[in-house]
Amino acid sequence: MDQELERAALVALLRRGDRPWPELTDHIETVGSARDVLEDALDASGQGALFDTEPAADLESVAAEIAAWEREGMRLVTILDDDYPLDLRLVHQRPPFLFLRGTPVSNDLRVAVVGTRAPTPEGIAHARAIAGGLAERGVTVVSGLAAGIDSAAHGTALAVGGRTVAVIGTGLRRSYPAQNAGLQQEIAERGLLISQFWPDAPPSMISFPMRNAVMSGYSLATVVVEAAYRSGARMQARLALEHGRRVFLMRSLMTHEWAREYATRPNTTVIDGPDDVFGELDSLVPATGELTWA
């Protein structure tokens, strides 16, 4: 029950809206207890309770709501839980919680394959070749469930019998774009859906950049297939470099000034095709050897 009440306290703190979520996440991690942080917040405000009842009853009410989410197949993992993804925990933009639907795997090698929603036929072909080859080698293919390159990456990973993870920009109860509802369900059944938003959260202008930050932090590398300057994929490449992760850029991107500039940075590799990514897989595994891939 203690861990359940810790999760409930974290949810209650976030709903209060007293502090920005990143600041609150840092503070909760430092203190080591969301319940202690909540008690301090209530004491400071003189409120004494979350609503109009005793604090313990308040937390039990929120815990019951969390239990209802989990009965619906949405597992809540917080920054205080041991099974919060370690790689994501290390980045500044880590969210205070994740909702998961599907099967988490803690020691898989994860590579994000991302790109434009309006790809060329060549872009689709590259995305399929890269995602399919990664999946066949036992690598988890991560993408954002958007139309275009993302959908091609997810679909191909599933088609070859591999594992794929979708980091989405809405709550888990929503499907965006609507035409990907079937793909979203298949990923939940055969891989994993991740959301950093409340279950009913709609898509928004800020939710997708936030999603890209989580996707970068969750993955050990990002492959950008096709992307314009004003795109989530370009943003994810920038974030991945900030996170100290490897970035692979298709050579066709070198027509863009942003890609040429990124290509000069450490940890960036310009690739001509899938084999250039596959040849770098060993270099993605940390010295601990705790990640596994076939």
Regions found by a protein language model. Give the residues of each.
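Glycine-biased, small-residue-rich flexible motifs in mid-sequence functional cores and linkers
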Residues: M1-E6, I79-A294
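Short, small/acidic-rich helices and loops at N termini and domain boundaries
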Residues: M1-D81, Y262
